[in-house]
Design a protein with these regions (language model features):
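Fibrous stalk/shaft segments of extracellular and virion attachment machinery
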Residues: 1-26
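Acidic, glycine/polar-enriched metal-coordinating patches/loops
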Residues: 1-7, 50-132
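Alpha-helical interaction segments
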Residues: 9-11, 37, 104
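Residues that act as N-cap/strand-start positions at coil-to-secondary-structure junctions
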Residues: 12, 31-33, 108
Length: 132
């Protein structure tokens, strides 16, 4: 037998251009972060991390299937502040010196845009600092 799906005007097809009449929301991970943190690019597109200690972004989870994915990593300092960020080698920055300076004031908010270029290569844009 053959299964036939009834026509539904609200069905989205991956191989056709689609027009959305409502906002489309990317999945966002919101979490407290300290120590080694692994970002899951298969599940989430955006990340909101409240630093409760110094953070190292570890090798990310399975980004090979996410080539072309873009999003943001939002860093929020907790009420103490002075938290730092370091990166695994899969994360590449505009300068060889790493992610650059992030805000360290208590409750500061920074945004880092990213793009998955290929497996094991996530390009980070310049840090946009001190929102608020």
């Amino acid at each position: 037998g053959t299964n036939v799906q009834a026509y539904n005007a609200d069905t989205v097809f991956k191989d056709e251009q689609n027009t959305f009449t409502k906002a489309q929301l990317a999945s966002t991970q919101t979490a407290d972060a300290t120590g080694s943190v692994t970002l899951d690019f298969d599940t989430y597109q955006n990340f909101i991390l409240t630093f409760t200690g110094n953070v190292t972004l570890a090798a990310p989870s399975t980004e090979a299937s996410q080539v072309g994915q873009t999003g943001v990593i939002i860093i929020k300092q907790d009420g103490t502040g002075s938290r730092t960020l370091s990166l695994h080698g899969d994360y590449e920055t505009p300068s060889a010196g790493g992610v650059g300076t992030i805000s360290t004031a208590a409750n500061a908010v920074d945004i880092i845009p990213y793009c998955v270029l290929e497996n094991n290569r996530i390009m980070l844009g310049s840090v946009q600092i001190a929102f608020g």
